[in-house]
């Protein structure tokens, strides 16, 4: 909460209860308190924005000011109507406000647990070999935006904000109105910009990360920074025009203009088109990183990326992208699919790289399980399938931090964020990814998959791999 938020709640609570419950009011004192409540409500809207945890309190603050004004304006005939309507409205507002504070929180990201501090650098490139097919401008070329999270030995430097475009958000972000993200400027990412990469080893393995459909790359900051603190260079890709906000080269902010029919019947050609674009983005990023040491000596990453040990991780549509990338680009040595349903010909891929499938505890459709099992049956490089108990589809993002513990228990499953706290979900997911991918990426494993399963009671290994003959 900001400096104004707590006074707002206290003053609004006192004045609203006074109006709603007291039979012996002191109009002058109550009127002045109501004016203060309305002023605080207006001030928080102006300076902090109408973020979701405080909207009911801001509304009640304005309401008590209006009730006071109405009593002064028409102290006679309207007194009874004002009293009845005012008590009811203020009572409802207080209940809603209390529920908002009880269930919704200003998000806080867990501190990364690895031995390294975390730094970040953002890259913006144009792929002149590919036209941009998601805009109507025939002269557009594909712009690729990548944010690298990497290990560093220092915590000093300019802090990385949560949303790069925090003050230029479009009207909607990940399907929610932008005012709900007003408090996200307070989120600590536990990372600094452009710090030197850690000198504890010469080169670092790379994990490319592909986000879910319509979800900004920033909303996976907890997982990306956790993996970076353990010694990976995690390259989170934006998906311009299908997620918002994305800051392109030159500083232009674009929103979500692509809305594919995700609920339509198979084969989902629109989604397959997006997967093809994302897969090409991932390959292009590796090409650019290969040239980084020559083209950009000023980057902290130049000369320090182990491009012989590259993996890919993706959530939801990003998970399907990871499978496609593995099937078409042998530079990626290992892959992780976080609850991603497959599309098109992906279930028939014969992957020669190991694949880890981490799925949520959500009910699964026949289309999901059918595609998954067909892919597992054709694996050539080995694999594993685990379920995180209590998780939901969006648990792999930062979304669980939007709720308090009470909110997760009451609303987490219906909201698609599950009942697992973000810190626990991040640690569990990162432990599984690190244990599974370490051999393929030349890392010294701190734990094996059986050890990770023993350490985390929330992880359940599925018998699907053995049944599929992997």
Name each model-derived stretch.
Residues 100-207, 415-422, 435:
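Domain-level recognition of soluble alpha/beta enzyme cores
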